Amino acid sequence: MKNLLIIFTLLFSSVFLSSPSFAGWTKVDEGGGNTFYVDFERIRKHDGFVYWWELGDYLKPQMGYFSAKSYNIGDCRLFRVKVLSYSWHKEPMGGGTGITVNIPDNWRYPNPKSIDEYKLKSVCSR
């Protein structure tokens, strides 16, 4: 019985804890059944810029998708952000194969007291 418990524990850990869908995501906002996360564990800084992943998880599908992930670059000195890549996912928490979307190559300045301002301040301070 003890061996069965050990095997079950190892199997459970390898399936759920190693899943990239759930690793590292920290909830930063929620509303209307939607939840938004930042992966603070994978923040990278280089040449004065900060790079990070975001995830939006939707209660009701958005255009047929239950989640979306983006990879972003932030300029902490000028306090602006640009999305480098964006993908929609059929499964929650960024699961399943992503459909990459073309995005405009422009910098955005977060509105004061917005979730975007909070996220940029959070990643810049890490």
Which stretches of residues belong to each language-model region?
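N-terminal secretory-pathway/extracellular module detecting exported/lumenal segments
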Residues: 20-126
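Hydrophobic helical h-region of N-terminal Sec-dependent signal peptides
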Residues: 6-13
